[in-house]
Structure formats: structure tokens, C-alpha cells
UniProtKB/Swiss-Prot annotation:
Residues 112-136, 170-294 are annotated as: Disordered. The lineage of its organism: Eukaryota, Metazoa, Ecdysozoa, Nematoda, Chromadorea. It comes from Caenorhabditis elegans. Mn(2+) 1 binds at D57, G58. Residues 173-192, 260-294 have a biased composition (Acidic residues). This is Protein phosphatase ppm-1.G.
Length: 491
């Protein structure tokens, strides 16, 4: 799913530079998306002969990708990966530690500030781009069945768009309408009882006795007293009768005028006992059914974020970090962004895209209690590794790297050779439109014609942009691409 504009934003943000035997450029373009959620790093001389190029494809907001871009270079530098006996293990630990750092209280405050800065203030009653995105998401989700929405948000809490979608579609209208009617009936009944209160004291006594009996039998006395317990993730909603149906139903023990003979009292008492017993059984079933509903798929709706999306919990970013040294290149990747090396015209993948349907990813997701539906984790994220997204990382029995969504990167170390020409690091907005070899051919051809790295990056974004949003979404995503060439003459 995604929110799109009526026409793409094709203005590009650019960065370029050179030094220490290489030249580089980066282009980022918003495209058809309502918001630009990508971020990147181009850091020459991160340490001595090491340079860092990273692409961070954000989702659910810009805050985690921007935070990563601002903090990760120093975070890696402090760990002195270049001195590590096992560089891969060092970088993997650094990524997981950084993900832990993201959920720290101070970091969460900073993420919120970043998110707030990215929301333009409203003027003249016009909605900002974030509101527009929410509006479009709500419209899209309104056409999705309730059960599917519950699956989608089951492990990640429920956002404001989901609640709006429920109301827009009316999937919960049956129970809610019944509850509203019951509440109205209860209010009318309360009014009637108040009017009769001074006229007939004995009726009041009967009602109080009935309520006392309900408490002794274990039935709830009033609304709002059912227990909400923390529950595991569920994939389907369990339909149950609203508790208010039983609670607001007229009591068989209420009496009419509060006057009865001893014989009538005995008969009524027997009838009342039988009726109350049946009602107690029904109440117990209703209460159990309601608790099952709370303990099941509706738990995120009732116990989740209360409609407010939390930065770092409901947002995240991929991270494809390319560390270029004097004689080798190291890539640490978490997510579906990608780094590719051109070696004598041939594409050499320096990373592997992480998708939920991959065997390794599927096994971890299932082990953490998650599900995969239509290529999405719990029907939500269509990727399986990322910084942030801590709403998917709530299994208390597992460490961060073992959660449904993990920041643990794959690390590849590749020795550089004289045949190596350039490296491309980009988000899936590029790779969904072109294969690795297609990108290498495209870039190599332009470089051979004398184009600069910046011109190459611009052209690649334009080539991948879709003409419309009528297709499957290919070419409609944010685009960020970094191209780094090796200057052999300066070495």
C-alpha cells in the first residue's frame, strides 16, 4: 500500500564530491509518494582510508531514516570496525546496538522532534502532506475487510488510520449499534427508575438485591468492569456478543409494584432463581467471549497505541551501508536496499535483499510468533529487516536480533581489483524498476559518454520513474541512488 500524489515531484536533491581516489554523487527524488522518507550518507574519510556511503529507505515516517543518517556514522566510527579481528561480527553487533539505541528514551524524544519538524504547519485550513497521506491511507483501508486489517496490525498496534477505516467502512457497526441502542435503553430505564424511586421504595430494594446477587454470582455489576489482559498476537478477529447486551437487559427480578403475598414471593423467588441462573450462565458466556475478543485480535485495538503512531515503534528504515577502503569494500545490509559493484562491466551484488518470504526470514518470523501474508509480516511490513519498527519487536523471550523484524545485517567483504569501475548503492525505488545488471549497463554507458556521477544519478531516477500510478507500484516509490567511481590515476 502507498499514498500517491496526483503528479510526481521530480525536483532532485543532490550531493557530490571527490577525494582519496574516488568521486561520488547522490540524487534523491520524492517521485509519486506523498512524503520523501529516504535519507543517506556520503562520508569521505570516515577514518583515514575508509569512506562511508549509506542509503536508508524509511517507512511510516522520515524520523528513523533521518536519525540513522545523523547518528550511524559516528556510531560505527566509535566502534573502530577497521581494527576488529572479525569485522562482520563487529558490524552486526553495531547494527543491533544501534537499534537498541533507537528505542532509548532520549532517542525516542529526538525521533518525535524530527517527525514534528517534517510536518508543515497548516495555513488557511489547508491540510499538510501528512494529513493527506493519512486521508488516502484511510480511504484505501476502508475497502479492506476487518479481519485482514486486524491481521495487518495485529503485531504492531493500531494506528489512527485503522480506527478511521473501521468507522468509514462500518465493519464494526453491528456490535457498536447494538451497544448504542442498549446504552440508550439503559439510560431510559435509569430515568424511569429514578422517577419511580420516590413512589415505590420496595421496587428499589428488589433491584438492589438483584445487583447484590449478580455480584455474588460473579457477574459484572456495571459496564466497563471487564478485564483487559495482555495477549499474544492473533491473526483473526473473534466475533462475540457485546457485553452490554447482557448487562443492560431488563432484570426478571425487578418487579412491577413491589407488593406480593408470601405465596407469590415463594413462586417468584423460584422463578427468579431459575431466571437469574440462566442469565448468569449467559453472562458468564458473554464475559468469556468478550475476554477472548480482548485477548485475541482486538487486543491491539483496545490496548495498543490508542490511535497515536509512535516514531521508532510504528516507523523504521532499511540500512545499506557501504564502507570503501583502500583495497576492499565492506557492505552491511538490513532490508531491501542494495549495493552493486561493477567489475569489468559485470554486476557483482554486494548485498542480498531481505524479504519476508525468504526461507531464513520466514523461519525467524515464525519463531518470533509472527505470520506472513501476501509477502507482509503480520499483513503489514513487506520487508523483514530494519532499524526501528519496535512494535514488531515485543517478544520478551527473544533478543533484538531474533525478533520478527530485525536490524541484524548481512555483511559481505569484497576485495577490490583493478577491474572494478564503480559502486551503486540505492533503495528499492531503483531496484524494483531495474535489475542489478541493467543498472550497471545504464550507468556504465553514461560514464563512457562523459557524464558525471551526478548526471548519472539524475538520469537513473528519471529512467525508473513511472508514467502513472496505474500499475503495480513499480516506479512510484521514493528514489535515492549513490554512484561512486574509482579514480585509478590518483592511486
Amino acid at each position: 500500500m502507498g499514498a500517491y500524489l496526483n503528479k510526481p515531484i521530480i525536483e532532485k536533491e543532490k550531493e557530490e564530491g571527490s577525494g582519496n581516489g574516488l568521486s561520488y554523487a547522490c540524487t534523491t527524488m520524492q517521485g509519486w509518494r506523498v512524503n520523501q522518507e529516504d535519507a543517506h550518507n556520503c562520508v569521505v574519510d570516515l577514518h583515514t582510508d575508509w569512506h562511508m556511503f549509506g542509503v536508508y529507505d524509511g517507512h511510516g515516517g522520515t524520523e528513523v531514516s533521518k536519525f540513522t543518517s545523523a547518528k550511524l556514522p559516528d556510531f560505527l566510527k566509535e566502534r573502530k570496525f577497521w581494527e576488529a579481528d572479525d569485522v562482520a561480527e563487529c558490524l552486526q553487533k553495531a547494527f543491533v546496538d544501534f537499534d537498541d539505541f533507537i528505542r532509548a528514551e532520549e532517542s525516542m524524544k529526538e525521533l518525535k522532534d524530527i517527525g514534528d519538524e517534517g510536518k508543515p504547519k497548516k495555513a488557511g485550513g489547508e491540510a499538510d502532506s501528512e494529513d493527506e497521506a493519512d486521508r488516502i491511507d484511510t480511504i484505501e483501508e476502508a475497502s479492506v475487510p476487518l479481519a485482514e486489517l486486524l491481521k495487518r496490525y495485529g503485531g504492531a498496534g493500531v494506528g489512527k488510520s485503522l480506527l478511521s477505516a473501521f468507522l468509514a467502512k462500518g465493519d464494526v457497526s453491528d456490535d457498536s449499534e447494538d451497544e448504542d441502542e442498549d446504552e440508550e435503553e439503559a439510560e431510559e430505564q435509569d430515568d424511569t427508575e429514578e422517577k419511580k424511586e420516590n413512589e415505590d421504595a420496595s421496587a428499589e430494594v428488589v433491584i438492589e438485591n438483584a445487583e447484590d446477587k449478580e455480584e455474588e454470582e460473579g457477574s459484572p455489576k456495571k459496564k466497563g468492569q471487564k478485564r483487559c489482559q495482555k495477549s499474544p498476537i492473533q491473526s483473526e478477529a473473534k466475533k462475540s456478543k457485546s457485553e452490554t447486551d447482557a448487562e443492560t437487559a431488563p432484570s426478571s427480578s425487578s418487579g412491577v409494584d413491589g407488593v406480593a403475598t408470601e405465596e407469590e414471593d415463594e413462586d417468584d423467588s423460584d422463578k427468579e432463581f431459575v431466571a437469574d441462573e440462566e442469565e448468569d450462565d449467559e453472562d458468564a458466556e458473554d464475559e468469556q467471549s468478550d475476554e477472548e475478543m480482548v485477548d485475541g485480535s482486538l487486543a491491539p485495538l483496545l490496548l495498543g497505541s490508542g490511535g497515536a503512531e509512535v516514531p521508532g515503534e510504528d516507523s523504521g528504515t532499511t540500512a545499506c551501508v557501504c564502507l570503501v577502503g583502500k583495497d576492499k569494500v565492506i557492505v552491511a545490509n538490513a532490508g531491501d536496499s542494495r549495493a552493486v559493484l561493477c567489475r569489468n562491466g559485470k554486476a557483482v551484488d554486494l548485498s542480498v535483499d531481505h524479504k519476508p518470504e525468504d526461507e531464513v526470514e520466514t523461519n525467524r518470523i515464525h519463531a518470533a510468533g509472527g505470520q506472513i501474508e501476501d509477502g507482509r509480516v503480520n499483513g503489514g511490513l513487506n520487508l523483514s529487516r530494519a532499524f526501528g519498527d519496535h512494535a514488531y519487536k515485543k517478544n520478551q523471550e527473544l533478543g533484538l536480533k531474533e525478533q520478527m523484524i530485525t536490524a541484524l545485517p548481512d555483511v559481505k567483504i569484497e576485495a577490490l581489483t583493478p577491474e572494478d569501475e564503480f559502486i551503486v548503492v540505492a533503495c528499492d525505488g531503483i531496484w524494483n524498476s531495474m535489475e542489478s545488471q541493467q543498472v550497471v549497463d545504464f550507468v556504465r554507458d553514461l560514464l563512457a559518454k562523459g557524464s558525471s556521477c551526478a548526471e548519472v544519478c539524475d538520469a537513473l531516477c528519471d529512467a525508473c520513474l513511472a508514467d502513472s500510478t496505474d500499475g503495480d507500484g513499480t516506479g512510484c516509490d521514493n528514489m535515492t541512488v549513490i554512484c561512486t567511481t574509482f579514480d585509478r590515476k590518483s592511486k
